[in-house]
């Protein structure tokens, strides 16, 4: 998860707990468009700036100075989407919903986002949208559980291609602000329509998420 800017410098909060601070020179070389883009999540390849530190076993909550490396061909943005509150029965979220071809059940949530590996069918050169939503019924305070429901619209009746990507959905901070959960972590369940014969949302994965991780890290 990316925080900061070109003036104050960037800080990358890894999903493994370590905190990475890239040199300004390597950001300009490898990710020159970062200052003008809305990238919030990314894969990055890097070396540690200090040769005395071991890059194989980075410690959680420890800050490391890094140098981004373009030669590894591994720097790219992760698609990120909003989570919205679904309030109107006449909304098109369900009526235009397309089935997700496949979704990895090993989802994880940290640093303000829930993440999953998703495979979808689409038609090339046709725009598609993706999002997660929740309703009041999806918030179960008594059992410390939140359901998020995944949908996407390929805007195509005849998909011609298939794609796979890690995607990130912004966790809804208002859920923890307006609900009194009894623990400091809750169960997060991700539902989606998968396959071709399902007619309703189906649970595809779940994970534990700390309430503090509903907010993005503060720079």
Region locations from a protein language model:
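A short catalytic or substrate-binding loop motif that flags glycine-/basic-rich loops and adjacent residues
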Residues: 4
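First exposed extracellular module after export/assembly in secreted or surface-exposed proteins
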Residues: 7-219
């Amino acid at each position: 998860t990316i925080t900061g800017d070109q003036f104050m410098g960037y800080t990358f909060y890894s999903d493994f707990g370590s905190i990475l601070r890239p040199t300004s020179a390597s950001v300009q070389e490898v990710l020159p468009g970062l200052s003008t883009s809305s990238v919030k999540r990314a894969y990055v390849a890097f070396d540690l700036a200090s040769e005395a530190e071991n890059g194989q076993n980075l410690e959680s909550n420890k800050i490391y100075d890094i140098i981004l490396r373009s030669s590894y061909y591994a720097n790219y943005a992760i698609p990120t989407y909003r989570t919205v509150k679904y309030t109107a029965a006449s909304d098109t979220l369900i009526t235009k919903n397309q089935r997700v071809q496949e979704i990895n059940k090993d989802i994880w949530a940290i640093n303000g986002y829930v993440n999953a590996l998703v495979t979808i069918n689409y038609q090339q050169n046709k725009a598609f949208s993706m999002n997660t939503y929740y309703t009041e019924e999806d918030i179960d305070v008594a059992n410390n559980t939140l359901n998020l429901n995944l949908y996407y619209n390929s805007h195509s009746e005849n998909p011609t291609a298939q794609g796979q990507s890690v995607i990130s959905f912004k966790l809804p901070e208002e859920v923890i602000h307006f609900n009194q959960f009894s623990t400091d972590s809750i169960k997060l369940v991700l539902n989606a329509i998968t396959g071709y014969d399902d007619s309703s949302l189906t649970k595809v994965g779940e994970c534990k998420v700390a309430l503090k991780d509903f907010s993005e890290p503060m720079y």
